[in-house]
């Protein structure tokens, strides 16, 4: 069995390879201040809750919005597998390697709203060569707390459920949600969109696939509809969003009112930290 991806482990800070570009800002002490609002005569101590101000950290030289988007994808993989809700604050280190495409090693600061704390996360994401008629393929193979001692491993395509392999699916048929296969689909409601903010990230990934860094000219995006499909017969509708393997059909509009659509196939191969997103853009009928 031949594995197609490099092994992605924690960043080798001593590497001096000529084909590695390291953007590393000087280290600074960082502190996340907690600001307490002033009390008034009617407030009790239990009414006062800390507010966390916007955190402005050190951004790596040369780090652009697409780098941050890829960091968010890897962080989403981490959150979905650990049950956390960490939010990207800033990318502090970027190292690029050319390995059958581009391999991103990053260190980022992530905020945990559960306890108002910052964590330093190491990630490795592969902007991989396409193979299933998709336009973009993003493979996360490492995402862990910095200094955890965890090691990365190669992406094993043979570990992916065969129901989610092969050529990318076409856009939904008109009767998909009411036909004989309707139990395989779930149309996401507004409360799901509010609760699962990563769906907005997936829409941005669709924009990145379509426009690359030019996506920022079309932000903010507004999601119009999301349908999630699972191939198994025994996954209830309200659990499809939590499925390790799923296909997302997303329509959204840009800030300029352009309506767009994308298909994102999300797969995992059973290895910790691993996730693959295959993305296609769909031309909407005029």
Curated annotation (Swiss-Prot):
One Pfam family recorded for the sequence: protein_MS5
Taxonomy, superkingdom: Eukaryota
Region (Disordered): 1-49
Coiled coil: none
UniProt family annotation: Belongs to the UPF0725 (EMB2204) family.
Descriptive protein name: UPF0725 protein At2g20620
């Amino acid at each position: 069995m031949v594995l197609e991806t490099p092994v992605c482990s924690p960043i080798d800070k001593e590497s001096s390879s000529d084909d590695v570009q390291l953007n590393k800002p000087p280290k600074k002490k960082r502190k996340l201040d907690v600001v307490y609002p002033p009390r008034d005569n009617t407030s009790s101590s239990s009414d006062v809750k800390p507010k966390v101000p916007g955190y402005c950290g050190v951004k790596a030289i040369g780090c652009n919005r697409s780098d941050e988007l890829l960091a968010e994808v890897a962080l989403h993989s981490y959150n979905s597998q650990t049950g956390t809700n960490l939010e990207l604050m800033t990318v502090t280190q970027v190292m690029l390697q050319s390995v059958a495409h581009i391999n991103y090693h990053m260190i980022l600061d992530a905020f945990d709203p559960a306890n108002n704390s910052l964590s330093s996360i190491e990630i490795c994401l592969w902007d991989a060569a396409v193979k299933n008629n998709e336009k973009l393929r993003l493979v996360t193979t490492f995402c862990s707390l910095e200094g955890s001692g965890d090691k990365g491993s190669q992406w094993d395509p043979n570990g992916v459920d065969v129901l989610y392999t092969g050529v990318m699916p076409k856009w939904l048929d008109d009767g998909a949600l009411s036909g004989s296969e309707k139990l395989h689909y779930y149309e996401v409601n507004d409360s799901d969109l509010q609760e699962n903010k990563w769906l907005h990230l997936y829409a941005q990934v669709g924009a990145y696939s379509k426009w690359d860094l030019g996506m920022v000219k079309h932000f903010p995006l507004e999601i119009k509809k999301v349908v999630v499909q699972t191939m198994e017969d025994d996954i209830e509708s309200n659990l499809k969003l939590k499925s390790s393997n799923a296909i997302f059909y997303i329509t959204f509009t840009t800030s300029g009112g352009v309506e767009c659509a994308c298909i994102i196939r999300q797969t995992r191969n059973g290895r910790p930290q691993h996730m693959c997103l295959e993305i296609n853009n769909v031309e909407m009928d005029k």
